[in-house]
């Protein structure tokens, strides 16, 4: 089951669905490809510090902290009860969580070896500015980002009868990219190292 989530100001921020813990065999198959690609690209960057922008309940942050206990890992997201409850469940000595918007990151230039935004940029009002901020705090390192691949994503929603009044648009998605247009956006901020297409997403590693 999925639910619409809102931040402390009442703005729709997304459609919460535990895709990482789903027992649905189709979702599990899709997520296996997604996580495998994510792990491979993260391995290419081999960062010793990570800022995860829009970390949600902290599932990925916690996974990375366990896999890389020597790395400093910071997760930021909006103030929302479900998000902070998730943080309490996903703790590790090398994890730090902060309530903060993606548009203005309270970190120094080049403070992190990698900045990630996994299924986040489709939600933010100014994605180009958010990417620029991420590139600033990861200067000399990498960005690792993923978004739904359009128009495939909306087509799949409509095929299963979801969000028909909004032509398949998932609640909270205010930005939409094909693989090509997303790579073009990121290439303005650094060198695209690799762009992958785990169905039905686009995932890109960028050297900044």
PLM regions and their residue ranges:
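Conserved class I S-adenosyl-L-methionine
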Residues: 144-166
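A conserved beta-strand element that flanks and buttresses the S-adenosyl-L-methionine
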Residues: 116
